[in-house]
């Protein structure tokens, strides 16, 4: 018996002695090559069962994608683990794996079915209808999600949303290149290298006669509008060269060319109102203005307005010490100190009593 563990391959559900190689969705069973040939060659209904390869990495789940870079069939879990490891692995191109054909493992069943089809015309018609039904069912199974019939027995393998983000930018670049090449073939445009600066490649070839007609028409338009453009703009800076227009050459314009060809200002600038020129004063007017300024300066009043007359009178009466307002207590102390000083000064001299 095959030892079935987390690190061993999935054993065949029929013989239990060999490693499985395919997974049958209809039977929800893992089968080896021999058991798959025996089971699905029994009848036509069994041969129409959809089988897919087993993942070559874990060998325990049905394969969902085929990596072209690694040349390996991987299940959804292994695919996400391997291709999310680094940016280089994310660029691998993967495609969904299609079911195995019903004639892959059973040559006997194939020969038998061919003999039956050739010998019996009724069976030939039935076989043709069955093949058409099988093709339609196979296309529907890959375009649409599975129905509720096999939704419970898919062992974590679902078809639908996992195929939405398969083709990464490597394949999209290839598709874009193919589409551009096809578009150029449809338009009959030769692929040439345009190395010259300022040349725009045309996408539609113009015949020689059509080109000559366009050139003549453009010449007539230019000759008729010469005077109008000369009178309005005063130059030929807005005229486009005929050869450059027809051949796809972008005319190059520089500041020096525009200055030489158009000496006057543009129309948009001419329409704007001009700024008033700065007024120049004569020496006499300037002297008169200075005198008026000095007279006004002399007439200015800087008198201090008195809002409260009572406050002004009280401020004048308040005692001051060294020019600052002082309290009554401070004034009394100062007066006593001055009186004591005067007494000390008087006692310094002797008093002569008179008789």
Curated annotation (Swiss-Prot):
Q: Which UniProt keywords apply?
A: DNA-binding, Metal-binding, Nucleus, Repeat, Transcription, Transcription regulation, Zinc, Zinc-finger
Q: Which Pfam families match?
A: CCT, zf-B_box
What Gene Ontology cellular component terms go with this record? Answer: nucleus
**Region annotation (Disordered) ranges:** 252-281
The CCT domain is annotated at 286-328
Quote the record's binding site residues for Zn(2+) 2: 55, 58, 78, 83
- InterPro entries named in the record: CCT_domain, CONSTANS-like, CONSTANS-like_Bbox1, Znf_B-box
Tissue and organ distribution? Highly expressed in leaves and at lower levels in stems, flowers and siliques. Not detected in roots.
Which PROSITE patterns has this protein been placed in?
A: CCT (PS51017), ZF_BBOX (PS50119)
Compositional bias ranges of the Polar residues kind = 252-264
What Gene Ontology molecular function terms does this protein carry?
DNA binding; DNA-binding transcription factor activity; identical protein binding; zinc ion binding
Specify the inducers: Expressed with a circadian rhythm showing a peak at dawn.
Function according to Swiss-Prot or TrEMBL: Putative transcription factor that may be involved in the light input to the circadian clock but does not affect flowering time.
- The protein here is known as Zinc finger protein CONSTANS-LIKE 1
Q: Which organism is the protein's source?
A: Arabidopsis thaliana
């Amino acid at each position: 018996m095959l030892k079935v563990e987390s690190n061993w391959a999935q054993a065949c559900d029929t013989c239990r002695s060999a490693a499985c190689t395919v997974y049958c969705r209809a039977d929800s069973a893992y089968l080896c090559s021999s058991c798959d040939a025996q089971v699905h060659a029994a009848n036509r209904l069994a041969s129409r069962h959809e089988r897919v390869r087993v993942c070559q990495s874990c060998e325990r789940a049905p394969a969902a994608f085929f990596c072209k870079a690694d040349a390996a069939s991987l299940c959804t879990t292994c695919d996400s683990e391997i291709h999310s490891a680094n940016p280089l692995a994310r660029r691998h191109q993967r495609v969904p794996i299609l079911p195995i054909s019903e004639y892959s493992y059973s040559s006997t069943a194939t020969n038998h079915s061919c003999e039956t089809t050739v010998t019996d015309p009724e069976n030939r018609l039935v076989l043709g209808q069955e093949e058409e039904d099988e093709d339609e069912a196979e296309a529907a199974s890959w375009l649409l999600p599975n129905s509720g019939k096999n939704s419970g027995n898919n062992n974590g393998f679902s078809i639908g949303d996992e195929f939405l983000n398969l083709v990464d930018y490597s394949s999209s670049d290839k598709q874009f290149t193919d589409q551009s090449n096809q578009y150029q073939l449809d338009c009959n445009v030769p692929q040439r290298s345009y190395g010259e600066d300022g040349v725009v490649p045309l996408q539609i070839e113009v015949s020689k006669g059509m080109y000559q007609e366009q050139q003549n028409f453009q010449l007539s338009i230019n000759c008729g509008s010469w005077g109008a453009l000369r009178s309005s703009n005063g130059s030929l800076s807005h005229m486009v060269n005929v050869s450059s227009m027809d051949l796809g050459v972008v005319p190059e314009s520089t500041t020096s060319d525009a200055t030489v060809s158009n000496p006057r200002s543009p129309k948009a600038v001419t329409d704007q109102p001009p700024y008033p020129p700065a007024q120049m004063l004569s020496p006499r007017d300037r002297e008169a203005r200075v005198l008026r300024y000095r007279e006004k300066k002399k007439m200015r009043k800087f008198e201090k307005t008195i809002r409260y007359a009572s406050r002004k009178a009280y401020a004048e009466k308040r005692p001051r010490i060294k020019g600052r307002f002082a309290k009554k207590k401070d004034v009394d102390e100062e007066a006593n100190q001055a009186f004591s000083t005067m007494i000390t000064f008087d006692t310094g001299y002797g008093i002569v009593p008179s008789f």
